[in-house]
Amino acid sequence: MAERSALMQGTVVASHGRHCVVETPDGQRRICHPRGKKSHAVVGDHVMWQAAPQGQGDEGTIEKVLERRNLFYRQDEIRTKSFAANIDQVLILIAAEPVFSESQLARALITAEATHITPLIALNKSDLVEPFARAWERLQPYR
């Protein structure tokens, strides 16, 4: 039976369905799978992971998600989807055209406030003079 390696610390830098990419403190990246059926690790999570036994591939297993400073999520009527942890700021990118959804903007701002993450609203497509001016005016209450 192959011997398991010691637990190592890393940060999740990408998440793709049932696997994550974990970066080690020295900058190496390793594909890791969650232990168990449900993955609770999201980008930004600090995790404890374990490499596969020697001779059984280069991937690893996420054994534990460490305590989070915050968790950014998206919520609708049906479910909540977590997608980033331990972040300092969230950029909310709004397009001048098509017309942006104020309810989506409000949900993002409420989530940022609830999780103590500084929001930054950016208005895109400034080359579209009239739509940009209308969108800029609609953003007045958020300044």
Residues covered by each model-derived region:
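Structural beta-sheet core signal
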Residues: 92, 121-123
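Short glycine-/polar-rich loops that comprise or flank the Walker A/P-loop
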Residues: 86-89, 115-119
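Histidine-anchored nucleotide/phosphate-binding helix
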Residues: 104-114, 118
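Canonical P-loop GTPase G-domain recognition
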Residues: 118, 127-143
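N-terminal accessory targeting/assembly segments
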Residues: 1-102
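Residue-level signal for inorganic ion chemistry
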Residues: 44, 112, 124
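Short histidine/acidic/glycine/proline-rich micro-motifs that form metal-
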Residues: 96-99, 125-129
